[in-house]
């Protein structure tokens, strides 16, 4: 199996070198919000490779390391000689200080360890243009700069950090000890905008319209006269991929809709009617529910579930593709967050995404992932730009493994039915309350836990259903949704009264991190 790259080589971009910060994806996201394309690159990238990527700017992310420890994440020193503007954030500032001849010590030794919001006081600088002389920022550092490199000047301090911002304006190298990418830094977006537009001289013209034109051109060049298979789930991601591919290659696209028996209530019919009927996509439906459920019988480990579903999904494709001629490519709706969360060289795997892991190496297709540089909100914007209606673009996110990862433990038809029915009630009531645009994602989970209850005149011993509802911008971080109590009560009453084998409802009030959005 080979992967067709969707690297946007000719796009004006700022790259973020990944040093393992929990916030590094947010840096990239904030730069995109400014109108400049941005992507993460390994901290191991060489100066020659940076020159090949040809960015207009480089950001060194924060991270958990200490620059003076053996094995800490490093940087090719020649990158500082490329003449490309550089912004070091937190560990990134400490690293550039260390590499360019300054001094970094454990913050405890300097007496200036900082965690949480702090007041930054700055002097005039291109980085802080049009921001107040005093502003609130988020500090999160265990080490500190005590001496700055030659030709650098101090431009910012805080009560506990004498070098909160430094710069060498002649070489366009800047360092800040705080995190501008998080909302707690009140003028963080302005600082990043100053770096991107004023210092890096980026045009700020990145848009979904540009993305469509570039991707259509790239898809046509890649595919030629061959045919492409797309696994259509009816979710936002695969639907947007389908419409984008159809716009690029028309009838060369064949959509295979795999009904794996793990879909939401009424979803199979909706997919065929909506995308096959209204949009005219050529859809082949594969009824494979028994095949998937047989493979999943007795399996309770979530990673194993994902791998099984990922493998079976592609094997079904193989079966369908063998009936067709000139099919060379398989398209997937992999997002940038999927790629990031499946692990980098600075972070452990959070979970294996079915669009990233689990694909057999002997797969006979080449892989096309047109969305793998986009975040979720950008995919919605892309769908709108493609002329797709709101009820598709704003459809609830749904994982490829479907309800398999919303049933804890072993999957049974009874458990699946409790999730299908309870989820339908949840979606209906959230829409009735006018909250469907305010809540980024919401669904129900069969926890696998049974508890004692009383219904009518008898005792019950039935399942506990959890409601998960979160607010987010891009899926990288999330908070639980503050649904009004009266709405939650109505949902709870309906589920226990209308769904068999359920007698208890709980509400998940965990943010991301520490939890992921899905339970498995």
UniProtKB/Swiss-Prot annotation:
Protein name in UniProt: GMP synthase [glutamine-hydrolyzing]
Record keywords: ATP-binding, Glutamine amidotransferase, GMP biosynthesis, Ligase, Nucleotide-binding, Purine biosynthesis
Pathway in which the depicted protein is active: Purine metabolism; GMP biosynthesis; GMP from XMP (L-Gln route): step 1/1
Catalytic center residues: 90 (nucleophile), 179, 181
Gene3D superfamilies tied to this protein: 3.30.300.10, 3.40.50.880, HUPs
Gene (name only): guaA
Organism in which the protein naturally occurs: Streptococcus pneumoniae (strain ATCC BAA-255 / R6)
Keyword NAD: no
Role summary: Catalyzes the synthesis of GMP from XMP.
Any GO BP annotation: GMP biosynthetic process
Binding positions for ATP per the UniProt entry: 233-239
GO CC entries: cytosol
Pfam families per record: GATase (PF00117), GMP_synt_C (PF00958), NAD_synthase (PF02540)
An MF annotation (GO) of this entry: ATP binding
